[in-house]
């Protein structure tokens, strides 16, 4: 926290120490109307060049990313007279109020995996108020002579510690140029356009919204086809038993996708993604390292049926890919020992799918959505015991209302269930209310 405060102070001091002034111009680019400030060296006030302002606004519009949990375009842009460098600071203030009833989830987010399997006085009801997903971001666009348009982006929220600790957390920090993304960003396996907005921060349990360090290359053709390939930091969660041990990973996860955009303004798309993992572990019996291969495939997409109706979906299947299915993330099922031969290790099959529909009563102002999501863990060689996770369900219905272009109110109902291998099942319900302001 001290480091964060000191960083803000340093930025302020540097900004004040530079002998320059900022001239404001209100610029309207269709529905996007930010205030553009021009920096002039030497202390002279300069109203700025309208062409430079339009160029700066276009830079931010053309590099703006939409989809699940993505912020709006910034309200304020600072640019140089030649628009070679533009900077925006913004953020989102969010307050979620929730009430669990008929069973409470042991998580600040609605995660079916965390539904308690025994009913007790502690797991019947719960009320929460949470602002930890409020976030700040900084985005710079540099028009480089050698690299073309360069985007530098970083954002943070306050989910860095235990629930309600409000410790700052780095969400993303990356640079982009010539199709390359280098740094920390949302995993390439996640299709940001394949899930509707939810009040619940995590979203459908079969989705895969997660951050990771990576080197990625994306390419999009004018005909709507696109592809991407990435190497991402591996993270393995396993149950090793007495004959195996964890070791540091040696090979990044390899992820690739192909995508086709179609329909009105190419608002619809279908994407096929794949991930391959070479996961290292140590064989204590043989005294040497070995590997197990994890893999996964996913079909995802968004279809704009009409301006009034949108459909969303994704389906994933694979082995050893807990990092890429939200309900299983962090669970020890990437690699497990074989109970029929404890000298062997194995990966477990797992899958998830979700589908949702959104009805735009007043497009971009008032809409309602509902969806169903399910995750399953498969058996292999009798590894899973009766009390271990087998299946999780996630059902939601919500309504969003934009009181103004920047202020949003939302109401949501969630139902979730967990079933273990012994077919014992438990469920939970949650009501969410959200107020959110983008700035």
Question: For the regions a protein language model found, what residue spans apply to each?
Answer:
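Outer-membrane beta-barrel "beta-signal"
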Residues: 26, 427-439
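Outer membrane beta-barrel
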Residues: 80-109, 121-237, 255, 259-261, ...
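Outer-membrane beta-barrel translocator domains and adjoining extracellular loop/strand segments
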Residues: 103-108, 163-170, 193-200, 238-246, ...
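Repeated loop/turn-to-beta-strand initiation elements of outer-membrane beta-barrel proteins
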Residues: 146-147, 179-186, 223-227, 265-270, ...
